[in-house]
Amino acid sequence: MKIAVWHNLKSGGGNRALQQQIRGLALRGHQIEIWSNDGADNSFPDLKDLAPKLHLLELKTYIRFREQYRDGLSALFFGKDQHIKNMEAHSKACAEQINAGKFDVVLVHSCNQFFMPHIGQFINATPKVLYLHEPNRVLIEAWPDKLCWEAPAETKRWSALKADFFDQRQKRVWLRHERANYFTYDAVLVNSYFSNESLVRAYGQRGRVCYLGINEAEFPFLNLKREPFVLGLGTYYRHKGIDTAIEAVATIPAKMRPKLVWIGNDGGGGYYDAMVELAKQRGVVFEPQKNLSQTELVKILNTATCLIYTSRLEPFGYAPLEANACGLPVVAVAEGGVRETVIDGHNGIVTERDPVLLGAALQAVLNNTDLFEELLANARNWVKNKWSFEASIDRIEAALQAAAGRGVEERNAQAESLKQPIL
């Protein structure tokens, strides 16, 4: 197939998923071209030897003061703000080139800014498949402390109502466009059943689960000597739950308390500093690291004794499976997609977001050699049998071939069916 790809992703799990899919499809002989912008992460270390053709089109992100003022007035009438206009201009320019390229299918990945890509409304000559990692959770969940639609405290001061008049109306416009754009795609793929449930809650429609996989060649089991420390992976942001991990380690008696090594590629600032201070207060040796090479990451996955996974409602999460591939058991909070990748008592231990319960699970893995060896063996087989790279490419390839093989009438019927509510 001749496949066009569009994305606006930063570094992280979504970008790794994109690279894996492109690599796997390219190795099977499919011709691939990528559309993106300078603000996205297009370094693609996993694709250096394949060198797919990359088109970088302008995406304006800077908003001038007068545009901000105009957006505020426009929000009163539920008009589009400049951010949406800029993204639509970029998406339309990309779509014009894709429409003219005679592709068999378009694979669209998530948008770092809006989550839901806008490009679907402009692609009219080619079947289009959206791989959506998650909806815009800020618009539909209590994030981080309250739902963004929650009314402010009662007040009689007009100045205090600015957020309600302008900011919240802009959010409502974003949500309007998010829902409208969802229905422009011929098929929507998701990374877990949890993500599929999120689609139903956000859009009233489900997608199709298309599981990702792990390339064992990139995360090999090296059979190195294990050291008594706990490892965490994830950006230094609040939703990764680093505070939960620190509190869990702190429940382990001081004389046997392991250090907590945390590896992340992004984030910092106030939350990062707060976690360093929290660890000091709790008596936890906390070693945050950033931007490790693949070789360094694999080595530490092969020398740690346990991975603690505390992300909040993570839609999928690569880290537990990467750890399993390296023979590392996982202690995880039972939230989000991790309930599909970590089976309690098989390749790890799953429990509630309770530091005491998590700490007890960590101690069990750290101190019970028989349990550790059992989880290690199961973990490697779990990845090999259920989450292989080749199987994940089989799934995405089949989904794209199905979309490419549909006629215009069938695709139009599919698009209409997406608009029907689930009963």
For each feature predicted by the language model, list its residue ranges.
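Nucleotide-activated donor-binding/catalytic signature segment of Leloir-type glycosyltransferases, i.e.
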Residues: 272-298
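Glycosyltransferase donor-sugar binding loop
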Residues: 36-41, 259-274, 290
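Membrane-proximal helix-turn-helix segments that form the acceptor-binding/catalytic region
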Residues: 136, 147-188, 196-197
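Short alpha-helical donor nucleotide-sugar binding micro-motif in glycosyltransferases
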Residues: 299-304
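Conserved donor-binding/catalytic core segment of Leloir-type glycosyltransferases
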Residues: 189, 222-240, 246-250, 260-263
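Aromatic "clamp/platform" in nucleotide-sugar-dependent glycosyltransferases that forms part
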Residues: 312
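Conserved acidic donor-binding segment of nucleotide-sugar-dependent glycosyltransferases
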Residues: 344-345, 349-356, 364-370
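Short hydrophobic beta-strand element within catalytic cores of glycosyltransferases
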Residues: 329-332, 342
